[in-house]
């Protein structure tokens, strides 16, 4: 019998260990906040001593270009919000409720990486502990309009988000590193 839970978790682990986490080594504050084009979405000072994440729950078309900071926070919050909703918060707020949003957003590279690592580890450890029956169970009211979808579908979605935005993080790091090179 196939252990689908182990497959989902090992997919995320492999991507994190072999691709995303190593690509974050050496990230500087300048690069974290680098805006390669005008009007990027990023993280910005919020005027209260913290930082805010541009565009939360907005879906403009076309989507704005986003910085490394935005992408790192987006990946981290995708995991942390679902961890809060389905594993650590005993309330009844669905996964789109702002009460699941992290208390603070990281404004520099070191804090951004630490935030992402913590969110990854928390999400990973909770999904790794799920039984086959828990993977098949519908999300219920906490899933909002995805209430009838199984937990496994949410894990597939979060894995896809981590890999999609993680790949973008890698490309942005390459662009930053080569931004001043001249054509031969």
Description of each model-found segment:
Residues 3-102, 140-184:
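Short, contiguous alpha-helical
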Residues 100-136, 152-163:
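Acidic/histidine-rich alpha-helical segments that form the ligand environment
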